[in-house]
Structure formats: structure tokens, C-alpha cells
Amino acid sequence: MQTDNKYRVNPFPSKREQNFSPREIILIRLDFPCEREGFCCFAHQSLTMTTDLSWLSRTQLLIGETALKRLASSHVCVVGLGGVGSYAAEFVARAGVGKMTIIDGDVVDPTNRNRQLPALATNHGESKASIMAERLRAINPELELHVISSFIRPEQVLDSIAETPSYLIDAIDSITPKITFIKTALERKIPLVSSMGAGAKLDPTRLQVVDIAETFNCPFAQQIRKQLKKRFGIRRGLKVVFSPEEPIKESLMLTDGTNFKKSAYGTISYLPAVFGAVCASVAIRDLKDEG
């Protein structure tokens, strides 16, 4: 029976009835013997049964129970589910974050298959957000997931989310919507990490996490810095993932301007995934250390 977002649970007949929230049920350490081995309850919209939560045991072994509880009670929003954002979203889910919002209005294109997690030969034209939602729920069926699979104005992204996220991962790859989203997030003082350009580069060992004012050798970061300063007077205070590797300029290609993009750089399979991993690591490490 649900009362005030608590679930009345009594799997142990000889013990008094217990009141747990869904996340407390996942992570609680019982201080009495379990008379029904493997019993646990979790609810999302309704109360369901689950028998195995051991998939997070290696994470708890590394970061401890307290940090794991912090992640379980956190809400991470990933904006953009391409080569960077799709991997960031997966790594966040696999770390045990309890609530996520994923946002992308795009569909899978054949050219996405060289680097994007949702892209397969069998799903061209399908929504990236819907594909990733199915994947994340398969990783963690108890994940509270909010999916936005339509294009929305960047300044309205945060208004479209019912609950203010604990952390934002910006994996938008177009300059105009990206700077508008960044400005909105900074104004609202929501913790944020932003991915810079993963194109035209090959070496994954060069990635760094710095303030945007400290970026160099990244044409994308240069444009973001320029536009943030010009339009909003923002010069620093934005945590970014970037690579100082010299870009391979010959890999530049002009495009038709679709989705705010006038050009694109060549990409290799692994580098956007590493950018996504570093973005996820920044969010996870910051969240686990809160408090």
C-alpha cells in the first residue's frame, strides 16, 4: 500500500511492518536476518518485485554505500544523444543514478553508425531518444526516466523538466542552441559539464577537464567562447571536456545548415565515446562527493 510516497513493506512475518521510499528499498541494509532470501521491493508508478540488486555491488565496493545512495537519489539530465551524449547517458545509468532525463529530437542517420551508441543498420529513421530510453531501462528497470524526443528551444529545455536536475550534461553539437542552453543553466546555477568538439581528432589520451577560458586547439570551443562572451558576457565559470590535440583541418566538411550546423568534422569511432565517458565521470564524481 502506498502512503505519502512510502511503501509499507513486511516481507518478514516476525518483524514489524517497515516504511521505505523506493530508493531506500533499493539501498537499505537490513539489521535483522532475512527470512525470505532475495526478497526486495521497488516501485516506479506501482509496486513491483525484484530479486537481484547485485549489479551495483561492484560500484558500492568502490565508492561506498553513502556515495551510492547519493547517486541513487540524484537526477541527471543529458541533452543531446549523439556520439558523446549517448555514451554519457549509458555510463550515468550504469553508475546507479536513480533518475534521468534524456533529450534529443533527432533520428538515426546512416552516417551516425561510425560513432553513436543508438545507431544500427536496422534502425535508420528511428528516434535516438526512444532507442536510448529502451536501452537505459534494460540496464536498470527501476530507473525513473523522463524522455523528450522532440526538438525544443534551448532556453525552454529546463522548463520542460518537471523537477530541477541535480546535474546537467551538455552534449549539444550545434553552437546556437548550445550557448543558449549553457547561459540558461548558468543563470539557474545548476551544476553543468559541457562537451567541446570531438571531431578532427584521434588521441583519446589528451582529454582534459578545464574551465572554458583555458581551452585551446579546439575550433568548436573557440566559437563557444566567442559567442558566450559576445552575446551574454560570459567569459569563464563553465566546466568543459576538451582535447588540446591539434585538429586535422583537412577533415572539415561544409553542410547545408540543417539543425543549426553549417559544417562538420570527420570523426573516429572511439573518441566521442571517450568524451561521453569523461562527461559522465565529472557528473558522477561531483554527485557522489556532495554533502
Predicted regions: what is each one?
Residues 84:
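Hydrophobic/small residue at the entry helix of a nucleotide-binding pocket
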Residues 78-81, 102:
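Hydrophobic Val/Ile/Leu positions in short beta-strands of Rossmann-like dinucleotide-binding domains
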Residues 149-156:
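Conserved SAM/SAH-binding loop
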Residues 104-139:
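Glycine-rich phosphate-binding loop and adjoining beta1-alpha1-beta2 segment
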Residues 94-99:
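Conserved S-adenosyl-L-methionine
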Residues 47-77, 110:
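N-terminal charged helix/coil linker that caps or initiates catalytic domains
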Residues 50, 162-167, 172-177, 187, ...:
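Glycine-rich phosphate/adenylate-binding loop
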Residues 34, 40-41:
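Cysteine-centered motifs
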